[in-house]
Amino acid sequence: VMERLGLGPDDCKAINKKLVYGRMTGWGQTGSLSHAAGHDINYISLIGALAAIGPADRPMPPLNLVGDFGGGAMFLAMGMCAAFFEAERSGKGQVIDCAMTDGSASLMTFFFNFMAQGLYKPQRESNMLDGGAHYYNTYETSDGKFISIGSIEPQFYKELRERIGLTDKEFCLLYTSPS
């Protein structure tokens, strides 16, 4: 669109050689989806984020923060900061292209790495960080609100058990990996 309006990176850099031109797309500048419309939910679905967490029977609606802000804006901002630094040093601007799918996929490397090692099961609610561990989850309270519990480390889990009076031996062990 910007190129059609005469405001593309080449047009603008002809006016200012130090210009840093940033643009963000969902799918990237090239490839089969480069001209397809989409939204954050589409981008993070394609890279596997919706399959990684949530209830076992369905993906949970995502926070748009993952695709739009985490996978898109933050990566674009980092690229632009590096380009500003380079433009100041060398006098040459550059074009920073950021695709939300690429940035979102990089945010998923923790899950992809653990899955590749057999340390993370593909079934939701069967892993420590996806609702499968009773000590890292959310629970409804008696007033209809929710509380989040995140007692992963042994010392915090021990304190949680002591404070709520959880003495059943079944709850004395922390999560162990499936391997």
PLM segments and residue spans:
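N-terminal helix-loop segment corresponding to the beta1-alpha1 unit
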Residues: 1-79, 83-89
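Short, acidic/polar N-cap/turn motifs at the starts of alpha helices
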Residues: 9, 95, 136-138
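Conserved Rossmann-fold dehydrogenase catalytic segment
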Residues: 29, 57-67, 88-104, 124-131
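Short beta-strand-initiation
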Residues: 38, 133-134
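Oxidoreductase and adenylate-handling cofactor-binding alpha/beta cores
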Residues: 47, 72-94, 106-117, 159-167
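Short Pro/Gly-enriched beta-strand edge/turn motifs at strand-loop
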Residues: 117-123
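Aromatic-enriched alpha-helical interface/lid elements that frame and gate functional surfaces
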Residues: 135-177
